[in-house]
């Protein structure tokens, strides 16, 4: 098991008050590492697939980042990344299910990172 996954699970189970965590379902852009999400934000100019391809090419890993339909539990913000036109929160997520033709199916929990666009207002 990856050390980051162990830390995320420990954080979710020991550092916060006892509560049920709500899972979210839907399409999400996920990457294996926070650094990959930061790079995704740098090359993102409105086309998610092009940015994903760029990161995957740089990483020499066709699966480093992907857009997928999942069920996940979101963790706390671990950083903010900016491009010239967008700003994103970077958050860890633990994927607990994937969407199949029969609906969402549970999977072994796996840690990934995702960007969440910040709505910025001109002042």
Q: Where are these predicted regions, by residue range?
A:
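Positively charged n-region of N-terminal signal peptides that target proteins for export
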Residues: 1-4
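SH3-family beta-barrel domains
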Residues: 19-58, 67, 122
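Serine/threonine-rich, low-complexity intrinsically disordered segments
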Residues: 15-16, 116
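Bacterial N-terminal signal peptides
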Residues: 6-15
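Residue "hotspots" at secondary-structure boundaries inside conserved domains
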Residues: 63-65
């Amino acid at each position: 098991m990856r050390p980051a996954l162990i830390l995320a699970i420990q954080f979710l189970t020991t550092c916060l008050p006892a509560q049920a965590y709500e899972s979210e379902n839907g399409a999400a852009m996920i990457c294996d590492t926070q650094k990959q999400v930061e790079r995704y934000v740098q090359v993102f100019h409105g086309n998610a697939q092009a940015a994903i391809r760029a990161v995957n090419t740089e990483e020499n890993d066709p699966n480093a980042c992907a857009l997928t339909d999942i069920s996940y539990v979101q963790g706390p913000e671990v950083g903010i990344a900016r491009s010239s036109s967008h700003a994103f929160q970077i958050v860890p997520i633990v994927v607990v299910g994937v969407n199949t033709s029969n609906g969402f199916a549970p999977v072994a929990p796996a840690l990934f990172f995702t960007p969440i666009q910040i709505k910025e207002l001109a002042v």
